[in-house]
């Protein structure tokens, strides 16, 4: 009986861990090339399971692009030494990370009806250049690509 119970416990653990790995994988993102975006913070939400930065970037074509950038959870922000108010509206930051394989448009509604609610392209942050100019790792899924030659700079005309 104990052997059967033990096998069932192992089986349940293996089956349930797949969804956790899927949630924390970069399968949705194109990790073959890192992308860099520079813009102004519109909103920052330090929430679980992932923080969200709403960023506006002025392109070389003069158009403003909106980005929804996924970052670390609140406990990881704390481990990195950041307070929940580390980013404020108006801060200029640069982010390096990965775009989704498919175009994802989505909206996060703020409970405060007077707050801005933005729709933007989802972007997974790996490296940030903070308002004070310091670089900070925000991920561990290939940050080396943010320094590698050939990364895609969103400011470069296509």
Language-model features: where?
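PEST-like low-complexity, intrinsically disordered acidic/proline/serine-rich tracts
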Residues: 27-158
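Bacterial N-terminal signal peptides
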Residues: 9-19
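Boundary at the C-terminal end of the N-terminal hydrophobic targeting segment
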Residues: 20-22, 27
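Bacterial N-terminal signal peptides that target proteins for export
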Residues: 1-10
């Amino acid at each position: 009986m104990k052997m059967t119970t033990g096998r069932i416990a192992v089986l349940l653990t293996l089956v349930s861990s797949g969804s956790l790995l899927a949630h924390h994988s970069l399968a949705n993102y194109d990790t073959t090339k890192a992308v860099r975006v520079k813009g102004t913070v519109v909103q920052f939400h330090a929430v679980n399971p992932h923080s969200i930065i709403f960023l506006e970037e002025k392109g070389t074509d003069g158009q403003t692009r909106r980005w929804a950038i996924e970052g670390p959870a609140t406990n990881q922000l704390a481990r990195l030494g950041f307070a929940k108010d580390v980013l404020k509206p108006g801060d200029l930051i640069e982010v390096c990370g990965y775009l989704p394989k498919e175009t994802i448009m989505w909206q996060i509604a703020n409970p405060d009806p007077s707050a801005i609610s933005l729709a933007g392209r989802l972007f997974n942050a790996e490296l940030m250049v903070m308002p004070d100019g310091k670089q900070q790792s925000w991920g561990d899924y290939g940050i080396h690509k943010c320094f590698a030659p050939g990364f895609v700079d969103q400011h470069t005309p296509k």
